[in-house]
């Protein structure tokens, strides 16, 4: 491989909007993100269920398609 053509690979501090921070390696020193595994609903178990049946009923009522 050629020398001096690759960017520097250094320790990167990743900071989330929720306040959580962790370190990884990257070519930048700091990285700010909006959501991480500490605050994402999938990882925290705070998922909300979508009520698809209610949406269908609302559509039918709106366009008078109910029987």
UniProtKB/Swiss-Prot annotation:
GO annotation terms (biological process): translation
GO molecular function terms attached to this record: metal ion binding; rRNA binding; structural constituent of ribosome
Any Pfam family the entry gives: Ribosomal_L31
GO cellular component assignments: ribonucleoprotein complex; ribosome
Keywords: Metal-binding, Ribonucleoprotein, Ribosomal protein, RNA-binding, rRNA-binding, Zinc
Cofactor: Zn(2+)
Cofactor annotation remark: Binds 1 zinc ion per subunit.
Residues binding Zn(2+), per UniProt: 16, 18, 36, 39
Presence of the UniProt keyword Electron transport in the record: no
Assembly: Part of the 50S ribosomal subunit.
Family assignment from sequence similarity: Belongs to the bacterial ribosomal protein bL31 family. Type A subfamily.
Function of the molecule: Binds the 23S rRNA.
PANTHER family reported in the protein's UniProt record: 50S RIBOSOMAL PROTEIN L31, CHLOROPLASTIC (PTHR33280), LARGE RIBOSOMAL SUBUNIT PROTEIN BL31C (PTHR33280:SF1)
Protein name per UniProt: Large ribosomal subunit protein bL31
Source species taxonomy: Bacteria, Pseudomonadati, Campylobacterota, Epsilonproteobacteria, Campylobacterales
């Amino acid at each position: 491989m050629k020398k001096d053509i690759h960017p520097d690979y250094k320790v990167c501090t990743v900071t989330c909007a929720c306040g959580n921070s962790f370190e990884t390696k990257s070519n930048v020193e700091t990285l700010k993100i909006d959501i991480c595994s500490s605050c994402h609903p999938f990882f925290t178990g705070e998922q909300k269920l979508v009520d698809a049946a209610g949406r269908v009923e609302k559509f039918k009522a709106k366009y008078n398609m109910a029987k």
